[in-house]
Amino acid sequence: MKTRNDQDRLDANGDSTSDRPVEEITVEDALQRAVRYHNTGEFGYAVELYTKVLEVSPNHPEAMHLLGVLGSQFGQHEEAIGLISQAIENSPNQPVYHCNLGNVLHAQGKFEEAKQSFQQCLDIDPNMAEAHYNLGCVFEQQGEVEDAAQAYHKAVAANPKHVGAHINLGNTLQGQSKLEEAIQAYQRAIGIDPNVAEAHYNLGCVFEQQDQISDAVEAYQNAIDRKPDYIEALNNLGNIHRVLGDLDEATQVYQQVLSISPDVGETLYNLGVIEHKQGQMGKAVEYYQRAIQAGVSFTKVHRNLGYLLKERQELNEAVQIYRHALDIDPNDPEVHMGLASVLLLRGDFEEGWEEYEWRWESESLLPFKRDFIQPFWDGSPLGDKTILLHAEQGFGDAIQFIRYADTIANSKVNIIVECQPELVTLFETMDSIKQVIPRGESLPDYDVHAPLLSLPRLLKTDLDSIPNQVPYLSPATPETTMILDDPSKLKIGLVWAADSDSEVENWLMFASASRSIELLDFATLFDFEACQFYSLQVDSARTDIIIYDFEDKIIDLGASFDTFSDTTAAIMQLDLVISVDTAVAHLTGALGKPIWTLLPVLADWRWMLNRFDSLWYPTMKLFRQEEVGNWDTVIQNIGIELTRLIEDGPPQLFETQIYSMNEAMQLIGISPNTYRNWERRELVPLVQRDPGNNRRYFTKVDIQHLQEFVSRRRNS
């Protein structure tokens, strides 16, 4: 046949750059020369020669086959299938033809046809390792792990030095949790070719899965040494350093990734996590935003960014981020929880309560999910039905939302409450509740049920309809053996540490560590000689009194508390409670006693934003942290407020300025145990609506107004 001399070349336009005459060569010589061009990447010359062979010998199977293979390399799959299929028709017993046809069909996603081609290849040559390997790849992509592993086993049996088969066998074994066998497969691949970075990387993944961290680090480093731009290996190595707390080392590795590719979303996210942990919130926000712009497909970056935006009080932006996350994954419960926390924080109660129902799918709250035989109450009138209200999450949540028992009570409905054993005697003081059952004991018959924190949604609570009449809880018994009788001083209860062991924590809502304060930070308050402080702590934080040598400043009451009724008995004898955001703060507010609550910058949704009073507890005053981790200003403000109270005239202070409705009734000559329902119902709103009563306690003028009101009401 005639063709160009192999010294000739064509430019990009296909024009000849040589005037030399063509030479006569055989078909086989032309085919060999085409294969050489093909293998060296000179594809244009290879195509030209394959084509000329077919011009001379139209049914030449090898030329058809190789031209089809070359076409498939450039994505011309249909043409490739036609050429290779025609080659098979002309020479059906060539196993490599069937194997390469299978490869093209696989590339097109025609898995079943591809498997048939590979099987036809193996029918001709059962020991063709490449066909077993390719068949395993199809099985693996279809999720048929057992068949894939079997195919890879046959591939390495046919060719023990087939590196790819060893690696893929390791992958399938890892997917089957056969980790030791996977390690052996990867190590065999490395033994054949130590420079295959993928084998080292996969080996590192298995070591990490087995918590063999040092081996994983070594394997990842080996992969990186052989492939310095191996982004996956760098990311995993950075992750290990981050988890181990080597944040500087992790940052260095992540930055190496970004120097290779600046838009790796996972790396940007990981850098955001590091900055977040180090308190560099601005940098963390920047990295999270860049990760989202890079198109990350996971929602955890949105969750973290939403949390930080909420912490910076950029609530509208946080809502947008959470909604964006729901576009990616509408069923991510943590995103719904994050959205709920922001909506509730800014007062969007209707949507916020709806989103909060996703808590039952949240990993942190799954232990609190309950299954009941009877239906979930839908908020419709109860009539004479029996409803089971069950507490969920922490003590504070139960105390706050048990108020709704009074809201749904009527003359016919029977209310049963199931709660933590520590709350039973306390909740039994509510007249609206027929029976209180400790959690874990058998339940009586009931018609419908509802968790306490679903009641605001069911009852359509908004900012203007929060049931905030206090007290709605009272001491279990009128008499107590605990007597705090020191009329010479202002008696102040103190709680400085949140107990994360007893109350559920959800990082999307708030964390106990940020709510707690070192007892030492209160030291300046202990210098007030007019005050006697009593510890209401019941956990290990009580030892702080001894550690900081405050035994002469603080009387430890918590050691004698077994239930919240014990705590209640103490609180009722105190003039004031100062507490971080704990169950004691809720309890004090529910008892209608004065409570000063100390809040971190990122406070829980129930305290809203920029308020110094509580919509839930009229007798509560909020002291807000201005800077994360810095409680100095908060303590200073408490000191100023204490000074004002003392200067108002202790110890007679609470004879003329009182917080409790019970005390108000006593001052105007009405027994708290006997005053009429209309007095309780109408007097509380009267005082709470008093625009001059900004400090949330009754003055002499308030008492005079109350007396005049009661007199007019009774005379009418």
Model segments located where?
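Alpha-helical solenoid repeat scaffolds of the TPR/TPR-like class and their adjacent stem/linker regions
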Residues: 1-576, 581-649
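Short, solvent-exposed alpha-helical surface patches in well-structured domains
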Residues: 426, 524, 666-667, 705-708
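Polyanion-binding surface elements
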Residues: 651-677, 712
